[in-house]
Amino acid sequence: MSNNNNNNNNNNDEENSKLDIVKKQFQEKEKQRLQSKLEKREISNKEQIDQSSSNIASETLLLINNLSDDIENRLNEISNNTNENKAEDLKESYNQMEESLSEINSITTMSSHILTSYDVKSILENIDNLRKQIDKSKEKYMPKQKLSLTRKKTKTTTVSTKTTSSKEDTNETFNNNNNNNNDNDNTDNNNNKISTEPIFNLINIKGFKNKELFYPPKKEEEIGNQDINNNNNNNNNNNNNNNNNNNNNNNNNNNNNNSNSINDLFISDLTDCTVILDMKVLTALKINNLVNCKIRANSPIDGSIFIDNCINSIFSLVSRQIRIHYCTDCQFNIFVKSNPIIEGSKQIKFSSYLQNLKQQQQQQQQQEQEKVLSSFDNKRFKEYSFDLESNNIDSDKWKLVNDFDWIQQKQSPNWSLVEY
């Protein structure tokens, strides 16, 4: 009886063992089946992702090509309609081209992870080519009006002097011609001296060290054209009443030049200087070769700003577009309508124009030198569609920097943000 029970137990154990084996085999097969299913699903998802990335890359390239074509079409239109181009229309076209170029660079930066290295290289080469075309077109079709007007006035004065002299008797004509020749020699010598001396007038600020300058200058403050103006006045003193009338007209023209209607300004070769721009508006601003300087604009630049080769300087500016080339250790407190662009630059900091202004007012409101800062008037800016105080689509563009030397998706090491 006992033997029978033992046999039954053994049989049960064997059956249970077989069942366990079968169960394990089934579980193993089920695991393999699920693993295979997951692998197939992953492959399918990857194919879909690859296809989606390919579609996105194609759409990105198409968008970039459309923007590039638009820039080229605008350049061709300007070139083909040279006689019909108006200054305001040209300025608007160039501003739109600058914004399109900035958008191309921004799109390329954000999409570099889905574009091939060949595509990225081609796009960057195209950006550089378009930049050169735009600069060349600007140089050709947007001449510097203020400089040409000044030259014409000088020529007019000289002709009028000669005409009056020709009406005098022979002896006086001979004497006056000798005097005029001497005056011309003095003018040439003075011009040679001026070229190496600082300049401060309506179109140029150049060559100063350790100075605080307020722009626009008053007539008596202008440096660089004074000798020429004095020489013209001496010639005019030898003329008759008709020439005195011409002299009055010239003075009226000079007074008009000192009005708030100003075009381009070029600032260059300054060291340890502070420049306060307090004009009504500028159409363009070019800055080059500054060391340890501060530039602040209390009014907008209704166009582009180009800044090159500056070191350890601070800029507080409002404009439609700003391009920064080959600068080191500089801070830009700005409000812009398109993404700032840097190239060949390092240790660059960006902050908000208005936030920086308010911080300085709080820290230095008791110092006399900061009276200029307290003169902030948003109406000046709103007149040219720059609203600094309300929250709008341009409020944060100061921080959306495009670094032409950095095409990776992660943050460029060449610039950083200063927030208050």
UniProtKB/Swiss-Prot annotation:
Limits of the C-CAP/cofactor C-like domain: 216-366
Compositionally biased tracts (Basic and acidic residues): 31-49
Pfam families membership: TBCC (PF07986), TBCC_N (PF16752)
Signal sequence region: none
Gene3D superfamilies given in the database record: 2.160.20.70
Compositional bias segments (type: Low complexity): 172-192, 228-257
Record GO biological process: post-chaperonin tubulin folding pathway; protein folding; tubulin complex assembly
Coiled coil: 9-142
InterPro entries, sorted: C-CAP_CF_C-like, CAP/MinC_C, TBCC, TBCC_N, Tubulin-bd_cofactor_C_dom
Keywords: Coiled coil
MF terms in GO: tubulin binding
Region (Disordered): 31-52, 138-193, 222-257
Cellular component annotations (GO), alphabetically ordered: cytoplasm
Subunit comment: Supercomplex made of cofactors A to E. Cofactors A and D function by capturing and stabilizing tubulin in a quasi-native conformation. Cofactor E binds to the cofactor D-tubulin complex; interaction with cofactor C then causes the release of tubulin polypeptides that are committed to the native state.
PANTHER family in the cross-refs: TUBULIN FOLDING COFACTOR C, TUBULIN-SPECIFIC CHAPERONE C
Function: Tubulin-folding protein; involved in the final step of the tubulin folding pathway.
Family: Belongs to the TBCC family.
Protein's recorded name: Tubulin-specific chaperone C
Lineage: Eukaryota, Amoebozoa, Evosea, Eumycetozoa, Dictyostelia
Gene: tbcc
